[in-house]
Amino acid sequence: MRTIAILAAILLVALQAQAESLQERADEATTQKQSGEDNQDLAISFAGNGLSALRTSGSQARATCYCRIGHCTILESLSGVCEISGRLYRLCCR
């Protein structure tokens, strides 16, 4: 009886590990599928005085920001988080 209980416990642990692996793969697939949607991101532009060095020269800096599902592109930096319809996105600005 003990042997059956031990074998059942081992089987449950193996099934749980496999289920977690499948969930990670599903999450990765979802992330990859959504990364194609980055081109449809919401664009936000801010016009105003930029760095203090620019303020002294009288010019204005302009930032364009996107609410991205995936990571920011090479030219962008993570500037915060934005929320659209209760869902959180990365705020990436250049």
From Swiss-Prot:
Disulfide bonds join C65-C93, C67-C82, C72-C92. SMART domains: Defensin_propep, DEFSN. Keywords: Antibiotic, Antimicrobial, Cytoplasmic vesicle, Defensin, Disulfide bond, Fungicide, Glycoprotein, Immunity, Innate immunity, Secreted, Signal. InterPro entries: Alpha-defensin, Alpha-defensin_C, Alpha-defensin_N, Beta/alpha-defensin_C. GO terms for cellular component: extracellular space; Golgi lumen; midbody; secretory granule; transport vesicle. PROSITE patterns: DEFENSIN (PS00269). One of its GO terms (biological process) is disruption of plasma membrane integrity in another organism. The keyword Cytoplasm does not apply. It is found in: Secreted; Cytoplasmic vesicle, Secretory vesicle. Residues 1-19 form the signal peptide. It comes from the Eukaryota. Glycosylated. GO terms for molecular function: protein homodimerization activity. Homodimer. Homotetramer. Interacts with B.antracis lef/lethal factor. Belongs to the alpha-defensin family. Host-defense peptide that maintains sterility in the urogenital system. Has antimicrobial activity against a wide range of bacteria, including Gram-negative E.coli, P.aeruginosa and S.typhimurium, and Gram-positive E.aerogenes, S.aureus, B.cereus, E.faecium and L.monocytogenes. Confers resistance to intestinal infection by S.typhimurium. Exhibits antimicrobial activity against enteric commensal bacteria such as B.adolescentis, L.acidophilus, B.breve, L.fermentum, B.longum and S.thermophilus. Binds to bacterial membranes and causes membrane disintegration. PANTHER family: ALPHA-DEFENSIN 1, DEFENSIN ALPHA 5. This is Defensin alpha 5. It comes from Pan troglodytes.
